[in-house]
Amino acid sequence: MRTYKLTIAYDGTRYQGWQRQANTDRTIQGILEKIISEAVQYPVEVNGSGRTDAGVHASGQTASVVLPGAVEEGFFTDYVNGKLPHDIRICKANLMKNGFHARKSAAWKIYEYCIDTGMKPDVFRRRYCYHFPCEPDLEAMRKAAGYLK
């Protein structure tokens, strides 16, 4: 068995989050599993380092998939990417030691939030930034963030 670590980027606007769901095909995990399963001609499970909600984007989410044998270099980044929708990409694929699991092996995660403080929403960043047309109270935000540790 071969375990691969996938680094994935996606624009989650059109999707119902990461986790596969019985009532929709519009999840990142579900689409990855469908495309990879079709490519290797047997069912696979893609495990994410965490779940995202509907509409959430990721620029470097880690996932893992176990295949019974090695695949050619470029299988994920060329072949699978060629079958994925334009808003989901496998940026990198690495062969890992058996036992690697994206969620269980995760040491840390980074969450980034974008706040647009302009008077009007930025036309190019409107899908990726929360529009708040005031200066935020940075000290209060720092204090609140301290409670998350």
Q: What kind of feature is each model-predicted range?
A:
Residues 1-149:
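Structured-RNA-binding interfaces characteristic of tRNA pseudouridine synthases
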